[in-house]
Amino acid sequence: TIGDMGANQFGNKCKPVESQRIPTSEEIQQQDWSAYKGKILRIDLDGSIPSDNPEVSGVRSHIFSYGHRNAQGLAFSKNGYLFSSEHGPKSDYEVNRIEAGMNYGWPHIAGRQDDQAYSYCNWSSHCKCDALKFSDYFCPKSIVTKPESDWYHPNFREPIQTFFTVNNGHNFRQHSCGHEFICWPTIATSSLAIYESETIANWSSSLLVSLKHGQLYRLKLDNSLSTVYETPE
């Protein structure tokens, strides 16, 4: 996986997020992989492009899926389904089932397409971006902010679980934890594993994710491994 490399925030605020950019056939022929940011890649052992990789916008490359912010954990089920865990901005960290050639929405969507607690503030689009003071909490009036519902893509896939979805107006600047980011409503999903044994009762077909607070979360999947049907515990 390759994240969006911190574009559109902090010291990189003037660098555009390229999670939606697809390489041209000319770039692939020239082995220019610069469009691979924000992607999950599928690569043959010799480094070449698998012949059955998906074509995205008419181009076959190492890209297996795109529209990612910071996919970290990857896990395959016994029957070959691929799952990923992904860091969001301040909430809406994701667990996804990855499908070939599908678009997972970033930076237009964080978590579900629900217009809650996230809208796309494209700092890099401002003609005087360098002169702006970056804020992780407020978008300047001079930058057009786009709600999630403004964006459409036929191949968009929502996550099967978010950690966590909060409503508009949520206070991300609580100081009770010592540092604001510690109080953000997320578990900072990193590594991911799938449990398919019958040894622990009722745990078969469960995804396991963890990081923040030293807590382990279990996501029980349905028989098709496409839906989380119990509240994570």
Predicted regions and their residues:
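Beta-propeller domain segments
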Residues: 2-232
